[in-house]
Amino acid sequence: MALKVELKPHEKIVVGSVIIQNGDTRARLLIEGEAAILRERDIIGASEAKSPAKRIYFVLQLMYLDQDVIAHKNAFINLIDAFMQAAPSAWPIISKITDHVISGDIYRAIKATRTLIDYEEEITHHELRHERLPKDGSDGNKPKAA
């Protein structure tokens, strides 16, 4: 069964190691066969992989596009271990990602890592907000005069 992919004008898609860019109008592609496929919006470049979760995503992306889990296995394991040390509460998400990798479904692991990125942003935002709170526990607002 063919995979149907609709592309917006000028949208890019990676099929295997080839980048395909659409022209000026919408297009529908039917792709048959086994190839790694990622839309432009699902790709994180090396320069964008600045957070631990995004680095995990980037390594999974390399595994998927290169079709070579072994070449990137050590980097993946090291990144996962470091993330778990820093945020043990992420275990349910990490577990799902690693289960997909173990079963060979790297595409689903990539999709599950989007949840990890969202979680990382949530806890980072919470920590930054917490750091800005006054040490006395107040919310920083002065009481209004009656």
What are the functions of these language-model segments?
Residues 51-95:
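Ordered, amphipathic secondary-structure segments that act as subunit-interaction surfaces
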Residues 3, 26, 43-44, 58-63:
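Short acidic/polar alpha-helix capping motifs at helix-coil junctions
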Residues 1-28:
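Short, charged/polar N-terminal "headpieces" of proteins
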Residues 81-146:
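C-terminal charged interaction modules
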Residues 38-39, 44-46, 54, 63, ...:
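Short, intrinsically disordered/low-complexity patches at protein termini
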Residues 22-50:
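Short, surface-exposed, low-complexity cationic segments
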Residues 10, 48-53:
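Feature detects long, helix-prone N-terminal segments enriched in hydrophobes
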Residues 10, 18, 34-36, 65:
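Generic structural motif
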